[in-house]
Amino acid sequence: LTANERAAIFEAVWQTVNDKYFDPTFGGVDWQAIGDEYRQELAAVDNDYAFWFEVLNPMLFELGVSHIAALPAELTNELEHMTFATGSLGVDVRLLVDELVITRIIAGSPADKAGLRPGFVIDSVDGRTVEDIAAEGLQTPPYNERHQQGKLAGDMRAMMFGEIGQHVVIEYLDANDQPGQAVLQFAPRISAVCGQIDPAMPPACAEVEFRRLADGIGYLRFSGFLEPALDSVLAAIDELHDAPAMIIDLRGNPGGTFPVRKAIASKLVGKPKPFIRYQLRTGLEETYLDPVPDVYAGEVVILVDELSESSSEEFTGSLQSLGRATIVGSQTPGSCLVMNTELLPNDALLVYPYGQSQTPDGRILEGNGVIPDIEVFLDRQQLLQGMDAQLRAAIDYLLETEK
């Protein structure tokens, strides 16, 4: 970029936030003074990296909120790699006591075929360790430990997705802490549906899976609140309509769009009850669920963790406050605002929040997250024994309430 191009992007970003950010007081931050300060820093910038990651985004992060970033054209796919990638290794990971531990393997995936199992510790991906990723990554708000831990795990998880056919080398420790290496090739995503959700972004994908557990309890997991997945999710709920209870697994679900989260919540409530309030620049806006036929009437438990963000937090927080669902897992990060995207000069992209989410009982989710009714953490030794402690706790709770 030339100096003039950088200046044009900078001014477009500052002005858009100035005019459209949800809070005209900017949370007490002097946005005018912040702009003046970073304009001075801009004058000393002589390369694009410094412009994007030492001036422009740090300026945005002064607001201390999620759902805000400015990205050059070549990085727009990085908004949420798990959402936009076509290929996958079929592995999910979390930071457990400072180790990057495999928490889930998709049957039939490259990771499954290579013998990787839940509980194995990943030391590096293509030579990059957790420490490397932590050093490279830009700290992003909200600045709480849950979000920072989740972001680090999420950055490592993003490396488990890529272009079909590309290879990746994973160094790991097995169940006996013996080192191993697996050379894996990204394969088409299992159980994923893909489609366009925003003209400014590439096609998005979400995995949808459901089954009946041994006790007849329904289990539904979907990896995003995305339009391409909505029909599959609603059909899964219909398939499980006679299950006495249903576990909806939103662990690791980074979010999606309002119509999708509202449609799924409506399928579980069926009455025009309050859903989410939005504090907008123009005032408070109330939203309501739709009265729909064929509502699922059984008990609902929702699984969440530090990577359940945005739409996952709205959906969960709303159903919790309405008394429709019991929440199990670990506290969500509080990365929960509604965002718009705006194209910038040179095909860059600005993401910014235009509304603050509140549950029907008035809880602000941004920065606070959803606190589970039953708090349970994953444990490596249990994973090695084939036990998902959070899922087990949900099943035990439902079996107890059925008595």
Where are these regions (language model features)?
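Cleft-lining beta-strand/loop regions that shape enzyme active-site pockets
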Residues: 162-345, 383, 397-399
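Active-site-proximal beta-strand elements of phosphoester/diester hydrolases
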Residues: 13, 104, 216-224, 353
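Extended, small/polar residue-biased N-terminal targeting/export presequences
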Residues: 25-98, 163-169, 173-207, 395, ...
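PDZ domains, with a preference for the canonical peptide-binding region formed by the helix
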Residues: 44, 118-169, 260, 335-336, ...
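Mature N-terminal segment immediately following signal peptide/propeptide cleavage
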Residues: 2-26
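Low-complexity, Gly/Ser/Thr/Pro-rich intrinsically disordered linker/tail segments
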Residues: 374-403
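PDZ/PDZ-like domain segments forming the peptide/carboxylate-binding groove
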Residues: 82-132, 226-227, 355-356
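Conserved PDZ fold ligand-binding element
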Residues: 111-147, 220, 247-249, 319-322, ...
